[in-house]
Amino acid sequence: MPQRIVFYFIAFVVLASLVYYGFSRWQDSRLKVDLWTLVPETAAFVVETNNHSELREHLEETALWESFSLLPVTQRFQENMAMLDSVAPGNQRLDRFLDKKNILTSIHVLGKTDVEFVYYIPVVSVGEHRFLRTLTENIVKSPAFTEQSREYQGMLLTDVTNTQLGTSFTYFSYHNNIILSASPVLVEEIVRRINRGKLTSIAADYKKVNYLSQADVYANVFVNYRALPDLLGLFVQEDLMPQVRYLSSFCRNAMLELKLDRNKLFLNGFSNPETLEGSFQAQLHPSKPRPLEIKLLLPTRTAMLMHFG
């Protein structure tokens, strides 16, 4: 009898542990994450879209896309997307998976010479989880790709290499979200950011701003003026960079709405002033007003006075 009680007790403890573990995993998977809190502070731009296909189709009709598509990072992205789409399961192509959801794209400068993107993609349904699982299985089976998984600070990272193009990307899953980039350095930076805890949004100043709820708005565009000079430095001569950095210090950040009208692009929104000492904004800070005593000496027939003080 005592042996049977001990056996039942051990079985109960094991069963309770399994239930608790399963519940914890389920609760973690249900936890909603603000993707803005995962974006590193080094991002020069962050673009949030909720209609990927429509934005891409409209951009492809503009002259801006002709210039943007010539960038190596854009060409690599298009080539990888085409290869991934070729192994996507059934008729559920990547465009369908990416469409009609809020996706973040952060733009970073690495090593003062390269532009890299990070994509933050929510997985919102059981069907999408099934699609991703089948896609990863097809990648493993495809001779066009090689896949290797590794652990980094408690996160399982997967490196996928396109053997035909010689390009690669790294991704990991975090609370029903996929974080993906061609730069493993940026992915690892995001993992370190998560492990530090107490995540704060890079766009915390604009928490209540969402232009996507308005008609004809294609994206929210966050501008980090403190990182913007590094991006502009890729296109501007070095001797002009001191002026670029100084002018960029007029604002700290901005949240803009993106609208497209045929071949025109419109950005409109709000900016916050830079508060650092020595910035352009600090130089323009209003000083204490002083009376214009020269008025006492002016003739009564003075029609106009120009004063530079």
Name what the model sees in each region.
Residues N162, T167-G233:
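A conserved glycine-rich beta-strand in the N-terminal activation segment of trypsin-fold
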Residues P2-T161, K207-C251, L265-G309:
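Structural boundary/hinge residues at secondary-structure and domain interfaces
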Residues E151, Y171-Y174, L260:
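Generic beta-strand structural signal
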